From Swiss-Prot:
It comes from Rattus norvegicus (Rat). Metallothioneins have a high content of cysteine residues that bind various heavy metals; these proteins are transcriptionally regulated by both heavy metals and glucocorticoids. A divalent metal cation 5 binds at residues 34, 36-37, 50. Class I metallothioneins contain 2 metal-binding domains: four divalent ions are chelated within cluster A of the alpha domain and are coordinated via cysteinyl thiolate bridges to 11 cysteine ligands. Cluster B, the corresponding region within the beta domain, can ligate three divalent ions to 9 cysteines. A divalent metal cation 7 binds at residues 50, 57, 59-60. It holds the Pfam family Metallothio. This is Metallothionein-1. The keyword Ligase does not apply. GO terms for cellular component: cytoplasm; cytosol; lysosome; nucleus. A divalent metal cation 2 binds at residues 7, 13, 15, 26.
Amino acid sequence: MDPNCSCSTGGSCTCSSSCGCKNCKCTSCKKSCCSCCPVGCSKCAQGCVCKGASDKCTCCA
């Protein structure tokens, strides 16, 4: 059970608007959580919910 998520891993939850789930790996959640990319990175917004600003974003790799 994720302490920041109202469901157990693989269960049903919503992570669409915020990243309360640490890993956001519930089956009902279509997007994963990651750090926000710097302005100008178009890849980050796809399939990802931003959890905070970061200059080193793995979504951009």
